[in-house]
């Protein structure tokens, strides 16, 4: 039986496209919030598949959409909003975070890879975690790390992206039964 997969994003959706192509499976539903055009350009591979919600969607708006699915796996890919507690408690939601919060809890929140790079952290990485109502507070279920000694900013972006994609692909293969 096919497991429903729902994704949320607030930025470009590029990560979703790369994961989907690698898995040879697209999400059953792709949700993004309405934002001014100058703040982002959505990956053209997603444009036809996207459902828009308000910039700051209400619990009711989210529940109306999600309730149509039976026990879906929900993944967040650059979703720049805190999920309401009632949604977190009712659904299995996972987030990818580009900061090694298992080692550096101060990297919770937006753009941790930039903070780690500028702070010359010796080890960097990313995690997948269960989503609860707090920002990056849920239980970490997987992590990938890399030596960040003397890397360039470009190398940091590539290493973080590659490790994040690896985590997502391996997690989704198991979770979606692929």
Language model segments and positions:
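One-carbon transfer enzymes
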Residues: 1-178
